[in-house]
């Protein structure tokens, strides 16, 4: 199964990045402003109609599983590995378990890059670019 992979260096300690990944307020400020629910380990959070279960929320690993309704994402896992080195936190990101590398996967790969840069801006500068203020890569998307 193909995966989406990205790497992002953030000039902040891992605890600050972890907080942005494991609180609804954090996720709301870098990914989707419509996020609600429980983003702690064992919780479930939503944005619009999309649902994600938090499988792991440890200081060096955050893992979510998507449960619907976007068919291409159902059962996929979104993983953030946090590594502190050289005075920065490296986020090793993967969106795992795609059934096939279709056009939507290409779109999502680019969108994940924009949202990881939004995460970086949130942690470093105090303001991210969550949906709907995110960088658009196609008309309306």
What are these model-predicted stretches?
Residues 1-36, 141:
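Hydrophobic ligand-binding cavity/cleft-lining segments
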Residues 17-21, 27, 45, 54, ...:
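Hydrophobic pocket/interface hotspot
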Residues 29, 73-76, 101-107:
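A short, polar/proline- and glycine-enriched secondary-structure boundary/capping micro-motif
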Residues 97-141:
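A conserved amphipathic terminal alpha-helix motif
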């Amino acid at each position: 199964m193909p995966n989406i992979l990205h790497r992002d260096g953030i000039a902040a300690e891992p605890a600050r990045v972890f907080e942005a990944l494991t609180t609804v307020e954090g996720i709301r400020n870098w990914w989707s402003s419509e996020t609600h629910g429980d983003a702690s380990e064992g919780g479930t959070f939503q944005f619009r109609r999309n649902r994600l279960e938090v499988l792991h929320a440890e200081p060096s690993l955050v893992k979510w599983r998507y449960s619907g309704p976007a068919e291409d994402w159902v059962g996929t896992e979104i993983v953030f590995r946090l590594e502190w080195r050289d005075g920065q936190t490296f986020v090793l990101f993967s969106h795992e378990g795609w059934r096939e590398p279709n056009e939507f996967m290409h779109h999502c790969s680019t969108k994940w890059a924009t949202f990881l840069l939004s995460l970086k801006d949130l942690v470093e500068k105090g303001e991210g670019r969550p949906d709907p203020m995110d960088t658009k890569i196609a008309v309306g998307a």
